[in-house]
From Swiss-Prot:
InterPro entries: DUF1508, UPF0339_domain, YegP-like_sf
PANTHER family: PTHR40606, UPF0339 PROTEIN YEGP
Family: Belongs to the UPF0339 family. Duplicated subfamily.
Keyword Repeat assigned: yes
Protein name: UPF0339 protein PM0519
Keyword field: Repeat
Organism ancestry: Bacteria, Pseudomonadati, Pseudomonadota, Gammaproteobacteria, Pasteurellales
Sequence-type repeats, residues: 11-59, 62-110
Length: 114
């Protein structure tokens, strides 16, 4: 089975962020903003490590009543979060997708495309 990949990007304010994409190109996890490239790369490494275990995920419900999930490191710090889903079942399928794709070592550097 083909794995997804990470896309490292520059945000509009010059900070770094990344998305984890599934093999079908769908974004399945979005990071927080990082002040440096190395911090964002460390975030990717944390997803590669912590994203393999479903125990590190937490399903939440947004103010608009849409479920989403967050991935947390062992220190309980949030590493990334999902999009909003139509149901908790869909959010849980998203978690399974992250666990299947988190180990990817493919990082597409899009920081020069901003």
């Amino acid at each position: 089975m083909a794995l997804g990949w990470y896309e490292l990007k520059l945000a509009k304010d010059g900070q770094f962020m990344f998305n984890l994409k599934a093999a079908n190109s769908q974004v399945i996890l979005t990071s927080e903003l990082y002040r440096s490239r190395s911090a964002a790369e460390n975030g990717i490494a944390s997803v590669q490590k912590n994203g393999l275990d479903e125990k590190n995920f937490e399903v939440r419900v947004a103010k608009n009543d849409k479920p989403y999930f967050v991935l947390k490191a062992k220190n309980h710090q949030e590493i990334g979060r999902s999009q909003y889903y139509s149901s908790s079942v869909s959010a849980k399928k998203g978690i399974v997708s992250v666990t299947k794709n988190a180990a990817s070592t493919v990082i597409k550097d899009l920081t020069n495309e901003a």
